[in-house]
C-alpha cells in the first residue's frame, strides 16, 4: 500500500475512512475468492478506497459508480495510474447492474468531505450556501429548500424525527414553517442552521455536535432517498457477486447500520464475516474526526447461492 494516494483535483480532496481496517479485513479472506476479477465500487467518490485496492491487488479490475460529476472527475485523476483496469460510470448504484459477476462490491455511504466542504453544494451548516443537498447537482430533483416549503409541518416533523432521530423535531418543524410563512425561503444554509440551533436550549448549543446536525442529516436523506437507495443496494448487490465474493459496506449512522446488519443476517445468499462492525482506530479517529461514526460490515456470498 502506498504511503500517499495519487494526487487528485484540489477541489475534491477526500481521505477514505477505515482504509487500513478494510484492507486488513480483506487480506484475511482467501485470495481465490476475490483478489482477482471485478470490483464494483458502488460509491466511487474521489476514488480513495479504489486507488488503495488497485495498488494492493494488481489482478483486480474496477468499475466505479458515482452520480456526482465532480467526484467522477477527481476519481479519474486519482485512478489514472491504473486507467487500463478502471471504468467509471455516471450512475447511482440503485440503477446499475454489472456486466459480469463481481468478486467484491464496496459501498461507502458517507457524504464525502468535498461535498461537505463546498458551500455551493448546500450540505454544510458551517459554510453558507444554497439549501440544496442533492448528491447530483445536475439533476432536476427536489432541493432541501423546496422540500421544507412543500411539506406540511406535521409531516416535516415526522421526517426530521425518523431520519435525523431528532427529539426536538416538532419544535424545529414549527420554527421552520413559521419562518417560511413570515419571511419566505431561507437565504441559505447558515440562516437555516441558525434557526434550527435556536430551537435548542442555550447550554445544548455549545456541545461538540452542532445542533443542526440531525436536521441536516434528515433532509439530506430525504432529498436523495438514501435509505431507499440503500435498501435497493442491499437487495441487488448479493446478486452481483460470484460465489465466495465479498460485500463490504461502510455506514455512518444508526439508520444505515441497522439496515446493513439486518440484511446481512436475513439474506439467505450471504454469510456474515463481521459479527460486530469494524470501527476506526483511536489514531485514525484523532487524524480524521469523520471516521468516528464509521462502521464497516462485510459478508460473503454463499457458494450454493
Curated annotation (Swiss-Prot):
Residue segments, region Disordered: 280-305
Its EC number(s): 2.1.1.199
Reaction(s) catalysed (UniProt annotation): cytidine(1402) in 16S rRNA + S-adenosyl-L-methionine = N(4)-methylcytidine(1402) in 16S rRNA + S-adenosyl-L-homocysteine + H(+)
Residue numbers binding S-adenosyl-L-methionine: 47-49, 66, 93, 108, 115
GO molecular function: rRNA (cytosine-N4-)-methyltransferase activity
InterPro entries xrefs: RsmH, SAM-dep_MeTrfase_MraW_recog, SAM-dependent_MTases_sf
Gene Ontology cellular-component annotations: cytoplasm
Record's keyword terms, sorted: Cytoplasm, Methyltransferase, rRNA processing, S-adenosyl-L-methionine, Transferase
Top-level taxon in the UniProt lineage: Bacteria
Alphabetical list of Gene3D superfamilies matching this protein: Putative methyltransferase TM0872, insert domain, Vaccinia Virus protein VP39
Keyword set includes Transmembrane: no
Single biological process term from Gene Ontology: rRNA base methylation
Pfam families found in the cross-reference section: Methyltransf_5
SUPFAM superfamilies: Putative methyltransferase TM0872, insert domain, S-adenosyl-L-methionine-dependent methyltransferases
Subcellular location: Cytoplasm
Enzyme class: transferase
Similarity comment text for this entry: Belongs to the methyltransferase superfamily. RsmH family.
Functional note: Specifically methylates the N4 position of cytidine in position 1402 (C1402) of 16S rRNA.
NCBIfam families found in the cross-reference section: 16S rRNA (cytosine(1402)-N(4))-methyltransferase RsmH (TIGR00006)
HAMAP family recorded: 16SrRNA_methyltr_H
Protein name (record): Ribosomal RNA small subunit methyltransferase H
Amino acid at each position: 500500500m502506498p504511503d500517499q494516494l495519487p494526487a487528485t483535483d484540489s477541489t475534491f480532496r477526500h481521505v477514505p475512512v477505515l482504509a487500513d481496517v478494510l484492507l486488513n479485513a480483506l487480506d484475511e479472506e482467501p485470495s481465490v475468492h476475490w483478489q482477482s476479477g471485478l470490483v464494483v465500487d458502488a460509491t466511487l467518490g474521489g476514488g480513495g478506497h479504489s486507488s488503495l485496492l488497485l495498488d494492493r491487488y494488481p489482478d483486480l479490475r474496477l468499475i466505479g459508480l458515482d452520480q456526482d460529476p465532480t467526484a467522477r472527475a477527481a476519481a479519474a485523476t486519482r485512478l489514472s495510474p491504473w486507467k487500463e483496469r478502471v471504468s467509471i460510470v455516471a450512475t447511482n448504484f440503485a440503477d446499475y447492474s454489472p456486466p459480469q459477476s463481481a468478486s467484491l462490491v464496496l459501498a461507502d455511504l458517507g457524504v464525502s468531505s468535498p461535498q461537505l466542504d463546498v458551500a455551493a453544494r448546500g450540505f454544510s451548516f458551517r459554510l453558507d450556501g444554497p439549501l440544496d443537498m442533492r448528491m447530483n447537482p445536475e439533476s432536476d430533483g427536489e432541493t432541501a429548500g423546496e422540500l421544507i416549503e412543500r411539506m406540511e409541518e406535521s409531516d416535516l416533523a415526522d421526517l426530521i424525527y425518523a431520519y435525523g432521530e431528532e427529539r426536538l423535531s416538532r419544535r424545529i418543524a414549527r420554527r421552520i414553517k413559521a419562518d417560511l410563512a413570515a419571511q419566505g425561503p431561507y437565504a441559505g444554509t447558515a440562516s437555516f442552521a441558525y434557526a434550527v440551533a435556536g430551537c435548542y436550549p442555550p447550554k445544548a448549543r455549545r456541545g461538540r455536535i452542532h445542533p443542526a446536525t440531525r436536521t441536516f442529516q434528515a433532509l439530506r436523506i430525504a432529498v436523495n432517498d438514501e435509505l431507499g437507495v440503500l435498501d435497493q443496494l442491499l437487495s441487488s448487490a448479493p446478486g452481483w457477486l460470484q460465489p465466495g465474493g465479498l460485500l463490504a459496506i461502510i455506514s455512518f449512522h444508526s439508520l444505515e447500520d441497522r439496515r446493513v446488519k439486518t440484511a446481512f443476517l436475513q439474506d439467505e445468499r450471504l454469510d456474515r464475516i463481521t459479527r460486530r462492525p469494524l470501527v476506526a482506530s483511536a489514531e485514525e479517529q484523532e487524524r480524521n474526526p469523520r471516521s468516528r461514526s464509521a462502521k464497516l460490515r462485510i459478508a460473503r456470498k454463499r457458494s450454493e447461492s
